[in-house]
Amino acid sequence: VNADSAIEYWENVDDVKQILLYMESIADPKRFRTLASRTTKKKPILALKAGRSAAGASAASSHTGSLAGADKAADALLKQSGVIREFSLQDLFNTAKVFSHCPIPKGNRVAIVTNSGGPGIMATDAVCEHGMEMAPLSDQPKEALRSFLPAAASVKNPVDMIASAPLEHYKKTLETVLADDGVDMVVVIYLPFLGLKDIDVAKAVMEIRAAHPDKPIVGVFMTKNEFFAHLSETQVNVPFFMFAEQAVEGLARLNQQRLWRKRTDTPAPRYSVDTEAVEAVFKQAAADNREQLTTGESLQVLTAYGIRVCRDGEAKDADEAVALADKIGYPVVMKLNSKKI
């Protein structure tokens, strides 16, 4: 069973909300693109494509019995098909966790609620690095936040409630931020503070998430591993992470899926090709028993396909080379054009 077959099988299965793939090769790129492009409009496809290095590609080829192919070509194909590519199993499952608990956002504006300035700044950097926007909170929610947060708190985005923020401040701040129409997604950050239990904050966040199902919320809880072990035994509706970068990466994937769904399906442009010229070049190479084209022949093929190439000419001695360079215009480069070298 290859990736094409898996996508085709799961495309119209309503119980399957997302498709995760581990791939070493793409046997039929055209079929893969057709199936994946259609399916990713309905549900996300996350792919871990192995064989990025030359050694890895060689191992994949011997393991699967098929040619792994150039990784850049595979990467381009995945992007053109709307497939979200991940580069580790951890990233694959982190992204899957976000898609499992979050809706697709309506925009790319992110708000951050935190009880510590440092992680809030790191989350802000990650938001900007992923091409998303920090949501500019409007005056009304700012005034509402000022009414109950201490004077030392910051009501700008990121909203820093300061370290001593009680559970009630988490609840009211998150509710206020979610009510702002200019906010599409929210990151909630918690650092341990005396008297405030991580699990209590998490439960409050999940209760609010249930009341606001249309906006993605991700949690960053920089606390003990026991917290995450406890979550595994609980019914959750919010993805929780240890670090801000992981959470923001998940939001970026949601935004990537949003942008893909917005794309209109337009037919690929078709270009006229001088097939006779191309055929003549390859026939001559075959007649000469050559496996490679010369520089001149390569330029002929590119020109026949309508691809713009640099101005060129052929010189057989130094005088011809100087005259040709003067005609083309400087700077110029010189390459050997030989069927033997």
PLM features: residue spans?
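Catalytic-core regions of core metabolic enzymes
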Residues: V1-I341
